[in-house]
Amino acid sequence: MNWDDMRVFLAVARAEGLTAAAPVLKMDPATLGRRVARLEAAIGAALFVKSPQGYALTDLGVQMRDRAAEAEAAFSLAI
């Protein structure tokens, strides 16, 4: 996972969906969906439960969100 993957993951997790995350990242929702799918394939596990109502984090997704948010905060303090 690289920094861009983490930013996409965090934005989708925080927005609870692709459509809401798209303007934050200035990306198309379909592109975000492909990025999330690629990340999940690389990890070998689902990070989100997808439904028409949005994206909800799986247990692994919650753990990853917490760690990614910690890394994001540490990075922000360092610069």
Feature map (PLM): residue ranges:
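The DNA-contacting recognition helix of HTH DNA-binding domains
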Residues: W3, P29-A30
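Residues within the DNA-recognition helix of helix-turn-helix
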Residues: D28, R35
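Short helix-boundary/capping micro-motifs
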Residues: A11-K26
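Alpha-helical residues within the helix-turn-helix
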Residues: P23-V24, A41, V62
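Short alpha-helical "packing" element that flanks the helix-turn-helix/winged-helix DNA-binding module
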Residues: D5-V12, M64
